[in-house]
């Protein structure tokens, strides 16, 4: 649930907030956010959570109000808790999310619902970029709500094992948001450890929220749920009408060529989110596009968390129209063959556990970062899979960033045929070897869900005129230029991150001057590439040659200060020559 109102497709006009008998302070905050009616998932989950005290397992699409479905009951219970009203603070609720970006997003929403609570309820985000001293000082105040990634929470618990800073025995609510992503990020081991800290047998209410519900949830349901109510919002039909999916078969270099043509000629109207499979790939594409005057910004795990959060916020405010995001989840999902998993799901359980433990060790590197799922990118018109993901599940997560909350959207994926692999070494990518195999799985998976992915054929005759200058620009983006750009970007963002953390807290009006889409010039700057000659444009986009603009009948008069042309003797250089003795 974003801070804006949910889509009309998900709103339940037949129900009202008054029917839930919520605390007046909470109703006032909800009204201030502009939520006139609860969404379908909220209308189903909130009564079950408040009146029947049931555990909730909910499956609903992005933009349907899942966050509000668990945050609203949590805050209502805290506002009506006599212990909280008396000022006796204890940790009452744990909210677990897969990424730092999502934890910050949830905290912002919680704070907006607590605006009329008179500071009786405190909420903290453990996954924020805070020092141990700051975390300890926040925990000493016994916040009622803790938002964190599983790994960060376990880290804090283990560090303070012999201290009285954090005690989870008073917890009455556990929420795991984006459950499938939490599991795919390798947090299962952390959740198993968390079980020993929680009072599971003492009226612990659990919310498990996700866009998909599958067999992976059974283990968590057994561990944390006692009497769950499973809610499934059947919204595939409404989503199907809003999302259009295409794939285009292309060569390794033509990916860059087509990206240049698409963005330079503004073939996509609105904001675009481009996914690449590694950090170098993102900087190569950024440096390539910059030479044509196409401004874009980068989002990857190397950047400081404060900068990443600011980039997402500015993108949502329409400051940037083009964002290149590195989806590094492919690094560990590629090891798992989806087809084998479907065929032998119940076989080799012991070896599967071994693979899971090995996989989780590799995932520790990137567990705090994620953009393909959960992060609230608003009003994305198009998702461009510049590099095809390595699993059909990752594809679903990526395209879920567009056509959200009932709005229309498009997804375009570049697919590399197997015969084209390795022909252009500089533009090649190792994961592209499996593109056709992954595409078959994606088409199969989407057809099961009632979606259609259509092939798209670019008119290469129209594009061919841009090839020469594209090749010229691509040659300028060397590996050295990429390395220097990464260093330069990291230095800039470290400075920006420090400013965001300190100076801009006191001077929010100056925050607008901080931009993340500044040019990272390659070694060779070619300014002429920023202009597209008229002869390269398609005929429909060219200006009418007959319309040459206003041509005056008489030439302009000579400027007053301009010297007149010499005449007579002065005009002849031989006659005007003076010999000086």
Swiss-Prot record:
PROSITE patterns: HELICASE_ATP_BIND_1, HELICASE_CTER, Q_MOTIF. Residues 334-368, 546-581 are annotated as: Disordered. ATP binds at residues 60-67. Residues 334-349 have a biased composition (Basic and acidic residues). The lineage of its organism: Eukaryota, Fungi, Dikarya, Ascomycota, Saccharomycotina. One of its GO terms (molecular function) is DNA helicase activity. The Q motif is unique to and characteristic of the DEAD box family of RNA helicases and controls ATP binding and hydrolysis. Belongs to the DEAD box helicase family. DDX56/DBP9 subfamily. It catalyses: ATP + H2O = ADP + phosphate + H(+). Keywords: ATP-binding, Helicase, Hydrolase, Nucleotide-binding, Nucleus, Ribosome biogenesis, RNA-binding, rRNA processing. Pfam families: DEAD (PF00270), Helicase_C (PF00271). It comes from the Eukaryota. ATP-binding RNA helicase involved in the biogenesis of 60S ribosomal subunits and is required for the normal formation of 25S and 5.8S rRNAs. PANTHER family: ATP-DEPENDENT RNA HELICASE RHLE-RELATED, DEAD-BOX HELICASE 56. This is ATP-dependent RNA helicase DBP9. It comes from Scheffersomyces stipitis (strain ATCC 58785 / CBS 6054 / NBRC 10063 / NRRL Y-11545) (Yeast).
């Amino acid at each position: 649930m974003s801070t804006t109102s949910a889509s009309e497709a998900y709103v339940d006009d037949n129900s009202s907030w008054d029917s839930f008998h919520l605390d007046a302070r909470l109703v006032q905050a909800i009204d201030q956010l502009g939520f006139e009616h609860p969404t379908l998932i909220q209308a189903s989950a909130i009564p079950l959570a408040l009146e029947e005290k049931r555990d909730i397992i909910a499956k609903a699409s992005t933009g349907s109000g899942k966050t509000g479905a668990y945050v609203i009951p949590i805050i209502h219970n805290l506002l009506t808790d006599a212990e909280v009203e008396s000022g006796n603070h204890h940790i009452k609720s744990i909210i677990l999310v897969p990424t730092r970006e999502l934890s910050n997003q949830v905290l912002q929403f919680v704070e907006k619902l607590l605006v009329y609570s008179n500071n009786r309820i405190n909420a903290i985000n453990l996954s924020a970029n805070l020092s141990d001293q700051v975390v300890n000082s926040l925990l000493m105040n016994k916040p009622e709500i803790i938002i964190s990634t599983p790994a960060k929470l376990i880290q804090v618990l283990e560090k303070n094992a012999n201290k009285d800073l954090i005690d989870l025995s008073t917890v009455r609510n556990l929420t795991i948001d984006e459950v499938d992503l939490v599991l795919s990020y390798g947090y299962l081991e952390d959740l198993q450890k968390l079980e020993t800290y929680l009072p599971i047998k003492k009226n612990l209410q659990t919310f498990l929220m996700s866009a998909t519900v599958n067999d992976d949830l059974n283990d968590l349901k057994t561990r944390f749920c006692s009497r769950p109510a499973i809610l499934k919002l059947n919204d595939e039909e409404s989503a199907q009408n809003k999302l259009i999916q295409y794939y285009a078969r292309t060569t390794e270099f033509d990916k860059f060529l087509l990206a240049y043509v698409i963005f330079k000629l503004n073939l996509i109207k609105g904001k675009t989110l481009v996914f690449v499979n590694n950090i170098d790939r993102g900087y190569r594409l950024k440096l390539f596009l910059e030479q044509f005057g196409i401004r874009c910004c980068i989002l990857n795990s190397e950047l400081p968390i404060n900068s990443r959060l600011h980039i997402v916020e500015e993108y949502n405010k329409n400051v940037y129209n083009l964002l290149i995001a590195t989806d590094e989840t492919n690094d560990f999902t590629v090891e798992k063959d989806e087809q084998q998993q479907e065929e032998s799901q119940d076989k080799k359980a012991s070896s599967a556990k071994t693979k899971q433990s090995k996989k989780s060790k590799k995932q520790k590197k990137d567990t705090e970062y994620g953009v393909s799922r959960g992060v609230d990118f608003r009003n994305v018109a198009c998702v461009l899979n510049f590099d095809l993901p390595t699993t059909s599940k990752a594809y679903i997560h990526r395209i879920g960033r567009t056509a959200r909350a009932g709005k229309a959207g498009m997804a375009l994926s570049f697919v590399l045929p197997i015969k084209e692999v390795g022909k252009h070494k500089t533009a090649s990518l190792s994961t592209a070897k499996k593109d056709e195999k992954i595409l078959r799985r994606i088409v199969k998976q989407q057809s099961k869900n009632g979606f259609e992915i259509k092939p798209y054929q670019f008119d290469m005759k129209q594009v061919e005129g841009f090839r020469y200058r594209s090749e010229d620009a691509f040659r300028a983006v060397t590996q050295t230029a990429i390395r220097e750009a990464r260093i330069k970007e990291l230095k800039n963002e470290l400075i920006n991150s420090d400013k965001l953390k300190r100076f801009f807290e006191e001077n929010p009006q100056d925050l607008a001057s901080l931009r993340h889409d500044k040019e990272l010039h390659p070694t060779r700057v070619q300014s002429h590439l920023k202009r597209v000659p008229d002869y390269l444009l398609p005929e429909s986009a060219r200006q009418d040659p007959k319309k040459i603009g206003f041509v005056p009948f008489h030439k302009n008069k000579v400027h007053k200060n301009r010297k007149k042309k010499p005449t007579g003797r002065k005009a002849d250089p031989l006659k005007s020559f003076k010999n000086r003795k």
